[in-house]
A protein has these predicted regions:
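Preference for solvent-exposed, low-hydrophobicity sequence contexts
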Residues: 1-200
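Extracellular/virion structural assembly segments
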Residues: 2-17, 21-25, 126-142, 187-331
């Protein structure tokens, strides 16, 4: 990724290889700051006015601690001037090589992951079950702004819940202010990263070892076709609450780093896939080396997304966040 055009929110998997051009001089001094702490500093040789930096994403992961989205800065000083870039790094893909060092993404909400990216003001919902819900009724959920991915700010919003079967459902609008927010309900927690997503998409899945993986892609998504289906027939008649809208999309991405090749290649065989929080299936995946570099690759696949059309809880699914099926592993 080009350091000159680094976005304000970036996945750790995309900053393992950083390039910077237009540097005057034979060397440059580089510093990496994560959550206010200097993590790395060193001098690098400049070749033909360009600089290539490696493994910065791995260093952010090592320094993140319990922060799911730490604030970071990269400073480059050279003879011809300097550059300072600040951004939020999101740990979006769990690599087995780093198991044990990463934040614990498992939560006790009925959601596919403990980190959700969503646009400002989006209508969302979280649901939870458990003995504490049954014993205490409906405790309020607390939503707080998080500073630098770690320090809590006292001001918070309380959200009242509603019973839906055995679950407590909390529906609310996310704040308009971009940033990281934490939802707390007893021992449960969930993070919302509020940002203008643009062409960025988050894929969550469970790999062949049933371990959670998060893949963050900047991709072009083209709708191919939609159809309405009824997933259940009772007494020969379709029930309205089983009505679903099934959409097929062509997803194409280029300039992907080598570190994402294996996770992306294995998507068709992964389970519990969701794209931007919506349950999905991946098929017809094709990959090839990028024309730009042998260290980058391109991919194209068909994503089939299914959304429930009816019931209040499933209406929240259209905000791309609410998980419509119960997953006991999160409770």
């Amino acid at each position: 990724m080009d350091l000159n055009s680094l976005p304000g929110i970036v996945p750790t998997s995309s900053i393992n290889i950083l390039t910077l051009s237009g540097i005057v001089g034979d060397s440059a001094f580089v510093e990496l700051i994560v959550a206010g702490k200097l993590i790395f500093s060193d001098s690098f040789a400049v070749l033909d006015g360009a600089l290539e930096l490696w493994n910065f994403g791995d260093m952010v992961i090592d320094a993140a601690g319990d922060a799911v989205a730490p604030s970071c800065s990269i400073r480059v000083s050279a003879d011809g001037g300097g550059l300072g870039v600040s951004f939020i790094a999101v740990v979006t893909r769990i690599d087995l090589d780093y198991e044990g060092k990463l934040p614990d993404f498992n939560s006790n909400f009925l959601d596919s992951s403990a980190v959700t990216l969503a646009p400002p003001g989006a209508r969302t919902a979280l649901a939870a079950v458990g003995s504490d819900i049954r014993e205490t009724g409906l405790p309020p959920l607390s939503l707080s702004f998080v500073n630098d991915g770690s320090d809590m700010i006292p001001d918070s919003m309380l959200v009242e819940g509603k019973l839906s079967g055995a679950a407590a459902v909390y529906e609310f609008d996310l704040p308009e202010k971009p940033g990281l927010y934490r939802a707390d309900l007893g021992h449960r927690h969930h993070f919302f990263l509020v940002a203008q997503l643009g062409e960025h998409h988050v894929i969550f899945c469970r790999n062949c070892m049933n371990a959670p993986e998060y893949i963050y892609l900047r991709a072009k998504v083209t709708l191919q076709r939609t159809r309405t289906v009824n997933s259940a027939m009772i007494g020969g008649r379709a029930k309205e609450y089983d009505m679903k809208l099934v959409s097929e999309y062509e997803v194409s991405a280029s300039g992907l780093p080598e570190s994402l090749f294996i996770p992306v290649s294995l998507l068709p065989s992964a389970s519990s896939i969701s794209i931007d929080g919506v349950p999905a299936a991946v098929s017809e995946l094709k990959t090839q080396l990028s024309r730009e570099s042998d260290e980058l690759f391109e991919c194209k696949f068909t994503a089939t997304l299914s959304r429930n059309l009816l019931t209040p809880a499933n209406a929240a699914a259209r905000s791309r966040i609410f998980r419509t099926q119960f997953d006991p592993s999160f409770n």
